[in-house]
């Protein structure tokens, strides 16, 4: 029997954290952060990390698990998220993954956990190679490899070819999770307004000081390449005015939100909800209750 879990996905600034906490309170859950930047200690404002008050409202996992000068990969996330899910379920609670890093979520949910002996850079390079092929070329590779998959589509073909190449046993690498993926969305202009407002609020909370500390101490770290920090470095070096740097930050965040939505729409099976709808979030809660009770209803 597969483990049921909830995923709250969507672009930045749509309220994923707030919904995740509400669902954790209603359904006896614990939250696993699915954000590539929130793993870093001392980076709180620019990563939009859950506040101490929010973390007190629901148990959070995979927040503050790396120092800012350490690297973090999709493989690290999958390995640690699997352990967190096992722990949460063992205590009779519901795992709720909250985040906007599409690669991390897809890697966990669709079985890209290929084992510690596999070079994840090789996996990603092979995935990039496959994505350059046409549908016909992909399906021909499936046929020539003798791989059997239940449903032929581009996403499943790429996944199957990866597993075939890097795993000794395709069946054993199948994901053991049954996710309900909640995608938060809204009118593009409203999302962009929320992003602009959020950046202004981050500045009020001390984003400049946080980014300056990172610039002074770890300017070459992986964590420093995240949106919210790198855009401010030209200001610190005197190459741009503060207004120019903040406008670039807002612009990059808006573009990132657009890429996030594209990823979730094209690469994952997501149930989308408009956050400005009068039915939200009750419609999410109702659908989730049905999903969680399906097993009992079948008995």
From Swiss-Prot:
Q: Which cysteines are joined by disulfide bonds?
A: none
GO MF terms, alphabetically ordered? ATP binding; tRNA dimethylallyltransferase activity
Site note Interaction with substrate tRNA, residues: 101, 127
- Name the residues that bind substrate: 12-17
* Matching InterPro entries: Dimethylallyltransferase, IPT, P-loop_NTPase
Which BP terms from GO are recorded?
Answer: tRNA modification
Which family, according to UniProt? Answer: Belongs to the IPP transferase family.
Name of the molecule in the record: tRNA dimethylallyltransferase
Source taxonomy: Bacteria, Bacillati, Bacillota, Bacilli, Lactobacillales
Question: Gene encoding it?
Answer: miaA
